[in-house]
Amino acid sequence: MPTPPFERFYETHRDEIYRYLVRLLGRGGAEDAFQETFLRALRGYAGLRHAENLRAWAFTIATRVALDERRRERPAADLPELAARDRRPAYAELEHLAGELPRTERAAVVLRYGYDLAYADIASALGSTEDAARQAASSGVRRLRRKGIR
C-alpha cells in the first residue's frame, strides 16, 4: 500500500495524537511535544516504504517524544495530575484513572484501552518487547483494581 500524502496523514492522526500527548504530559507539555512529533514524522515520512500501520507509527513517535520530554522534566512525584480533557466520557475516565499510574504503565493502558492498539504496536511505541508491553498494561490494570477501580 503506497503512503498517502503527508497532509492527509497529518489530518487523519493529529487530533488523537494531540489527545494522547495531553494525557501523558498535560496541556502545556503536549503543545511542544505535538509539534516535535509531527516534525519527526515529516522528516521520516518520505523514507517509509509502505503505509500498513501509520497510526501505530505516529503513536510510536509521540510516545518517544513524550518520554524524552519527561526525562527533561521534574521527577515523577512532581508531575501534575491529569484532568479529564476529552469530551468522550469513557476516555475522560480512563485519562483520569491512568493519571495515577507510573509512566510506562500509563502509556500502555491508554494505548491499549483508550486507542485499542495491538500489543505489538504498543511495544513499538514504548521501545520494548510485546511481552513487556502486555505486562505493563496488565500491571497498570492490576494496580487500578487494587485501588478499587474496575
Where are these regions (language model features)?
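Acidic, proline/glycine-rich intrinsically disordered inter-domain spacer in sigma factors
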Residues: 1-4, 8, 72-99
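Arg/Lys-rich amphipathic alpha helix in sigma70-family domain 2
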Residues: 46-50, 60-80, 87, 146
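A short pre-motif secondary-structure segment
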Residues: 108-112
